[in-house]
Amino acid sequence: MFVRIVKMSFKEDKINDFINNFNYNKVKIRNTQGCKLLELYRDKTNPTIFFTYSYWDTELDLENYRNSQLFKNVWNITKLLFKDKPEAWSVDKVYNL
């Protein structure tokens, strides 16, 4: 299992659009094969910055999601709302205390 972290910065007037789109699709994303957890975070000092944390069984599961119609639908809306280019990392958890 690994963690996918995505940092996204949105135009101020598009934040509600992003949140509405996320809320509409979050259960579908979470129910994607291999997705074990989906969380959305908002930066405390810059409210235009959000992070998603998702836990995936395998890289193939994530790739299958990224090639799915669901991802394409979500991303086609989301990418129009960005202020800056998103950043993404796939990481392995080293410690959990």
Regions found by a protein language model. Give the residues of each.
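Short, well-ordered beta-strand segments in beta-rich or mixed alpha/beta enzyme
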Residues: 2-9, 39-66
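Non-catalytic surface loops within mature trypsin-like serine protease
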Residues: 10-12, 58, 92-95
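Short amphipathic alpha-helical segments
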Residues: 14-37, 70-75
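Secondary-structure boundary motif
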Residues: 31, 64-67, 80
